């Protein structure tokens, strides 16, 4: 079963959870039917979730460049606390493996990137970059300025390049904040240029569950920043992570929404740019309140992460792709574990 159907159930759990008390006696409350029938978790895995353990699974994807992973955990806390923690992304996403993180102002300012250091390997790669052949994801205009404005033979070349990269990132953040998805760039690190806006739109096209279950949320994501949606928070932030073989500098747009008529929460974290590996990514998280309020506050946190990458090539491509998929699944597990700890105050 393709991930689009799976997430349809995931998002639908929010609506169903609000009516859980009206179910027939003996019926399983959300999200258990989804976890059992759609994700096909075993009784042992469902029991592990009830014990507060993180359970993850790799999902099928529509084509080779797209990878998907799902995870779930039961959290002893309130959805309101989750929303409060998620609003503070500098703390919420600050975990081992993300040594640098920052939030953009409105509008973005170059000072917002004060805590960012550019990896030495990226600076070395940029010295040799040319369109269609670069070890860093970069756009035509940015690459042109790095070639023309930085004297790579000078002693201060790395400092000049770092300052220019931050200037380019700030301009990119401003363009995205003003123009949304259509303002996302075109990378020219490979022989075939990649339009990041089209890569993200492909993820949305493969995600009709947003249209079916939360059309207002989907429309808001598509139209951002032109539309408005009640009970919604938007955060534009950046990170440098060290999870992979290379440090990755990324820019994200997080949207946190409390759907009307539910007690749950829906969040979408969109990758606006990544210096390596990722052409687009969309993470959808749903907090589904537990039906037994008498037992105390609690909710199930469901996480679906989907990304489009440049697939590995060559004789070891299958092995490398397996490692990439495993790494993404581990990332989902780590996110759920850290989120649970943040909400529970551990």
Question: Which ranges hold each PLM region?
Answer:
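A short alpha-helix/helix-coil micro-patch that ends at or immediately precedes a cysteine
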Residues: 85-87
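Terminal "cap-and-tail" regions of soluble proteins that handle hydrophobic small molecules
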Residues: 23-75, 79-81, 91, 96-346
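N-terminal secretory signal peptides that target proteins for export/translocation
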Residues: 1-3
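Sequence-pattern detector for short linear motifs
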Residues: 5-7, 35
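Bacterial N-terminal signal peptides
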Residues: 8-18
